[in-house]
Amino acid sequence: MICRSPLIVVMLFVIAAHTVLALEIATRIDASETESPVSAQMTRVSYRPITSVDNKRFLRQETTFEKKLGVNDVHAVHAEERSALGKAKILGRDLLWFMSILGRFLIPRIGRRGP
């Protein structure tokens, strides 16, 4: 039992790490569906004169506007989402594998008492 305790701790740590990574990837995918990519935002700077005694002063205005996504931008966003989904699937598969090992081999042996 003492020999298997470190193995169980390592297995539980790996399961927890995979779960956290899978949730992080899923959160990133959800965020990319609701927010526009940063590259699609541009800043336009314009100057307009202030009506005053001296017309030499100008006011700088920054306006952020959305740029229409081109075909390549859309493909890049979809490729990023596909790679994130692929990573999430791999993490999920590994998590199921670890849980099956834990359920099949380690948990039944923990309950048994040796002679």
Swiss-Prot record:
A motif (RxLR-dEER) lies at residues 57-82. Induction: Expression is up-regulated at later stages of infection. The keyword Mitochondrion does not apply. Its main location: secreted. It is found in: Secreted; Host cytoplasm; Host nucleus. Transmembrane segments: none annotated. Keywords: Host cytoplasm, Host nucleus, Secreted, Signal, Virulence. GO terms for cellular component: extracellular region; host cell cytoplasm; host cell nucleus. Belongs to the RxLR effector family. Effector that acts as a broad suppressor of cell death to interrupt plant immunity. Inhibits cell death induced by cell death-inducing proteins, including the PAMP elicitor INF1 from P.infestans. The RxLR-dEER motif acts to carry the protein into the host cell cytoplasm through binding to cell surface phosphatidylinositol-3-phosphate. This is Secreted RxLR effector protein 2. It comes from Plasmopara viticola.
